[in-house]
Amino acid sequence: MSPTEPRASQGSPTGTSPLRPKPPQPPQESPWFFWRSVLLTLAVALGIRQFLIEARYIPSGSMLPGLQIQDRLLVEKLSFRGRMPKRGEIVVFRAPHHFDPTLVAQHRTGPLGCLLVNLPFIGSLQGLQNPACDAYIKRVVALPGERISVNPAGAVRINGTPLNEPYVRNFCPVDSQGAGPCRSLDAVVPPDHVVVLGDNRANSWDSRFWPGGPFLPKNEIIGRAFWRFYPFQSIGRLGPASPPVR
């Protein structure tokens, strides 16, 4: 063999480079793995929203001045599983169309219907709105066994004692005879019910106006609004609670 003749590579009789094995390819993920992760995330998020805590926003001025339109709040759902609401607490509850006998007859809906309506972006679609699927936010003013009196201006007495409500700034207008556009109220609260009013007494559709009666059943309460997280300059705990009636 000539010294200048190229030698074949060792182990290759043809003189070509040996074939190297391809590196192992990572196994391809099944599309089901991705969708399973998405579904699991959604299930956890919906479970937290359904049973623990959820965010709500203020759509109207019924709780002015303490709660402004478009305020964002956190509502926790654990407190009232073991106790009744306390006076002064701000509660979120299902619309009276869901429990008021007169209104229920006009706006019937099933639980699945409200579940769909309350999903993000779906409830805003034209034709899907249902008053029975709405939620309201008001303040608890009277508890089971108490006699509540509300005069035409919106001032409250509990068992004959005036209720100190520093959060109320806007009472209903009344004339020289004490009459006005707002309804008065005089009733004894039954067990497992409360009476709720908006802080803006002149512009709140609350217990005073429900056609089937002024009482909110405890089991219709969604939760307690306890924290405002928007706007950022107003972040903080909600209050104040009304002092006890003596």
Tell me the role of every PLM-derived stretch.
Residues S2-R36, G47, F51-Y57, S62-R246:
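Soluble "head" domains of membrane/secretory-pathway proteins
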